[in-house]
Amino acid sequence: KAAWEFLAYKLAIAAGIEMAESSIEQVSGQYHTFMTKRFDRDDGKRVHFASAMTMTGNTEESIKDTSSSYLEIVEFIENYGVDVKANLHQLWRRIVFNIAISNTDDHLRNHGFILKEKGWVLSPAYDLNPSIEKEGLSLNIDMDDNALDFDLAKEVGEYFRLSKIEMEDILSEVRSVVKDWEQVAAEIGIKNREIEIMNSAFRW
C-alpha cells in the first residue's frame, strides 16, 4: 500500500500535481510507511484547512443516496477562491490524473482548501492511490457520470476555464508521465507480480 501511494506521488509530481513533500520509509522490519509533510502547518503555526465536503455544504448524510460532482468544487472556487483560473486548471489536471491511475477514492473529503489572506486556494493533493476495485471515480465529472474517461473530462473543460488547446496540453503532460508507471514502480522496488496485478488501473 505505501509503495503504491509513493508511486502515485512520484507520478503526480511529475505530472504537475501540487503535493506536499513525501517519502517512503522502512519503519519496522520489512514494512514501509508513506510519510508526507503536513501542509496545515507553517513554521509550527496552524494553517486553516477545510475539506471540499465542508466547503460545498455537503455532509455524509446529504450525499448518502446521491453522488457529488467536481462541478460543485468548481462552483466553490468560482465564488470564494483566489487565483481562480489557476486553481480550476489544477483541479482539472487532478481529474485527468485520477482517471489515468484509477484513483477512485477521490471523494469530497479527499479534496481540500487552505485559507490565504485573500481567500481560499486548493490544498496540495493528498491520499492518491491507484485502484483496480472500482470502475468509476467517487465524484462525478459532470453532474451524472463518473466514468474513467478522458473524453468526459474534456466535455466539462469549459467550466474549468480551459481552451481545447490547454486541455490537450494537460492531457499530453499527464499521459506522457503515467505511461512510464511500470518503470517507476520497478525503480521504487514494487515486485513484478504486483505490477502485473495492477496493470488495469493505468490508462494513457
Predicted feature residues:
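Conserved kinase catalytic-core segment
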Residues: 1-15, 69-132
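Conserved ATP-binding subdomain of kinase catalytic cores across diverse folds
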Residues: 1-64
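Generic, well-ordered alpha-helical scaffold segments in large soluble proteins
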Residues: 11-15, 39, 55-58, 76, ...
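Small/polar glycine-rich anion-binding or flexible loop at a beta-alpha turn
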Residues: 27-29, 91, 95, 168-179
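A short beta-strand motif that forms the metal-chelation/ATP-contact edge
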Residues: 33-38, 124, 179-185
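Catalytic-core segments of enzymes that bind and process phosphorylated/nucleotide-bearing substrates
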Residues: 51, 55-71, 76, 115-166
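Regulatory N- and C-terminal appendages and interdomain linkers associated
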Residues: 79, 120-122, 181-204
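C-terminal structured "cap/appendage" subdomains that terminate the fold
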Residues: 158-174, 182-186
